[in-house]
Amino acid sequence: MSAHQDVKKVVLAYSGGLDTSVILRWLQKTYNCEVVTFTADLGQGEELEPARKKAEMFGVKEIFVEDLRETFVKDFVFPMFRANTLYEGQYLLGTSIARPLIAQRQIEIAEAVGADAVAHGATGKGNDQVRFELGYYSLKPDVKVIAPWREWDLTSRTKLLAFAEENQIPVTKDKRGEAPFSVDANLLHSSSEGKLLEDPSIGAEEIVFQRTISPEAAPDVATEITIDFVSGDPVAINGVEMTPATLLTRLNELGRDNGIGRLDIVENRFVGMKSRGIYETPGGTILLAAHRSIESITLDREAAHLKDSIMPRYAEIIYNGFWFSPERRMLQALIDTSQHSVTGRVRMRLYKGNVTCVGRESPHSLYDTRVVTFEDDEGAYNQQDAQGFIKLNALRLRLGGQIGRRGGTL
């Protein structure tokens, strides 16, 4: 029996677009199996009912279209932001953080419907194939994974369109021509890559930006907002409590209107190549600045520095697709422990692409005006204590300096 004959039912991560519609029909023809479609609403801003109708058109009997926006923000985005996560110092991981949830629900659906395989539409060049499959294998080690882009001979857009035509797959007019760039989006961000953007020496045209106005076109008057945090997570804007997805949606609107969150980056993919991307993360950019600001008065110095030191590793773990790994869980436990006192309010000023904290307060603030004042501190801090502190810290430097002088190295 061939490997194709072993598969009776497969759960496909299905967007309803050209690529995954071709994959759906290809699975039916190549594997002669039942296909179950799963479409996740992660806030990508697209109408998802057409995906359901298209799946029905292909004879799919079990169709899952789910609104996962709240779960996405609460259980994936917010835990990541507690760490102030940036990959290679810049990227807020908007694509990376969406893949574990999709993989998780695919496996849950596969087990619920008795499927023996899962499939995705990620290409063989990118990171997403790794992220999806590491998620699958973490949650169901014996699952069979079908990655059509690594199997089929549809190696060009011309071949994809020809397959679509042969199999009566509807193709919208805008998909018939070569798209100038590829877009991926969710509630946290949008990314644009490829084709028009492949030359990193050429700046992106304004048409590329999907979610933000240009900073130059932003209002000439700053917008000020307050964000309330409880245990490291944002809970309210301007005093109005909101659900996680609603709050991020509102921050996206504020960031969009003020030209905030644009990034043009060349990053190092896990698979080995460098990739140029245009990212827009308006709400996330505000949230990162706000979270760091409330931490500045609530975290102990050494705890804050330790947290900053592990952040690059934590970011790399998520970027590479190891969300369900023991090392990510270990680091998450440490990060979450640090957030117990990260409660309070910050006031942020949004202006022409910039986010600035202009005020912060917390019932757990470690900032003591009695100690730091330039006026009489009434004995709160004895400046003479600094002499011994400096001498002890200088001891190794003085000893090293003496040896260096004797050896002629100073």
UniProtKB/Swiss-Prot annotation:
Q: Where does L-aspartate bind?
A: 123, 127-128
Pathway membership: Amino-acid biosynthesis; L-arginine biosynthesis; L-arginine from L-ornithine and carbamoyl phosphate: step 2/3
Q: GO cellular component terms?
A: cytoplasm
Indicate the transmembrane segments per the record.
none
Which Enzyme Commission number(s) are on file for it?
A: 6.3.4.5
- List this protein's GO terms for biological process: argininosuccinate metabolic process; L-arginine biosynthetic process; urea cycle
Residues annotated for L-citrulline binding in this entry: 91, 96, 127, 131, 182, 191, 267, 279
Q: What class of enzyme is it?
A: ligase
Family annotation (CDD domains): ASS
Where is this gene product found? Cytoplasm
Q: Which residues form a coiled coil?
A: none
Q: Which reaction does it catalyse?
A: L-citrulline + L-aspartate + ATP = 2-(N(omega)-L-arginino)succinate + AMP + diphosphate + H(+)
Annotated residues that bind ATP are located at: 13-21, 40, 121
Pfam families annotated for this entry? Arginosuc_syn_C (PF20979), Arginosuc_synth (PF00764)
In alphabetical order, the GO MF annotations are: argininosuccinate synthase activity; ATP binding
Provide the alphabetized UniProt keywords: Amino-acid biosynthesis, Arginine biosynthesis, ATP-binding, Cytoplasm, Ligase, Nucleotide-binding
- Quaternary assembly: Homotetramer.
Family membership: Belongs to the argininosuccinate synthase family. Type 1 subfamily.
What name does UniProt use for this protein?
A: Argininosuccinate synthase
**Species of provenance:** Gluconobacter oxydans (strain 621H)
Gene name, per UniProt, is argG
